[in-house]
Amino acid sequence: MLLLIKYTLLYGIVLMLVALGGMFSEHSGVINIALEGIMVVGGLAGVLVTASMPTTMAPALIVLAAVVAAAVCGMLYSLLLAFASINLKADQTIGGTALNMLATAIAMILAKNFNGSTSAKISYTNKPFLFSIGGLELSIFIPLGIVLLVVSYIVMYKTRFGLRLRACGEHPQAADSVGINVYRMRYAGVLISGFLGGVGGLAYVIPSVQTWNFEVGVAGTGFLALAVMIFGQWKPFNIFGAAMFFAVFKSLANIADSTVLAQLGWSSNIYNMMPFIASMVILSFTSTNSQAPKAEGVPYDKGSR
């Protein structure tokens, strides 16, 4: 039971962070399919910083440096999507898919260059990112994620910025008519998405293991986060609940060998498939009632106002 709680919290926070990133982007009017790639870039940046740090450095500084690197690199990578979608008015789905493929290729090249070999595996210490409560080893990203959840809610629903951001995703022409810079707000939404996606990528890669193979990227977690965002109806606390729900399924693969589930004799691949199967089943029943931002995915043309 403790293992289930541990991995549910670990994966739930990751899904929540990335889904919150998608929420900000889509509330601005930009569909961020590139969350998978942003996670890879953020995870790679954080891992490279962590692996490069001297072992004598204070753990808090290692965590801070890795998180900042992941967040900044995630934001920089998201700028590619923002420029293509907002300035060039490119198809956001195609652009995001291309960035997902590019991210994995970049990660493999940089990882192999870092190792000086043909292996894309990078080893590091994850101890600075872990803490214990009652004998249960947890990720430092759990309290950080809760803080970011509350901040996201406040920013989205209690500030002028959040009101303007949502206006740009619902009716950009009306927002523009009252003096809101739609392009700037959409850039802000995508950048925040990159920030949260990058941190989410680091939270996925580092705490659970001490070696990561970047040939596998983040194994579809970014796409699962999109399902979490939709199931959570683009609302922060709903997203948190949806993330924990899907995280239970994702955790089963990690605990199957050490629980009663081992008696079933099922392959771990079956458990790895469960969250994706659950997402398809749930979304097939709930998609008709989804209330997505009305202008998401639609490039804004100032001349058509």
Locate the predicted segments by residue.
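Membrane-interfacial amphipathic/re-entrant helices at transmembrane-helix boundaries
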Residues: M1-V18, I31, A45, P54-A65
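Short, non-helical or kinked segments that cap or interrupt transmembrane helices
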Residues: F24-A45, I86-L99, R164, V209-F223, ...
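Alpha-helical transmembrane segments within multi-pass membrane transporters and channels
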Residues: M57-L102, V147
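Loop-to-transmembrane alpha-helix initiation sites
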Residues: T93, S119-T125, E137-L144, R186, ...
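Extracellular/periplasmic helix-loop junction at the C-terminal end of a transmembrane helix
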Residues: T104-I133, A253-A262, T288-V298
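Helix-loop-helix "hairpin" substructures at the membrane interface of multi-pass membrane proteins
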Residues: L136-N213, P236-F237, G241
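Cytosolic-side transmembrane-helix boundaries in multi-pass membrane proteins
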Residues: S152, E170-R184, D257-R305
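Transmembrane alpha-helical segments in multi-pass inner-membrane proteins
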Residues: W212-F276
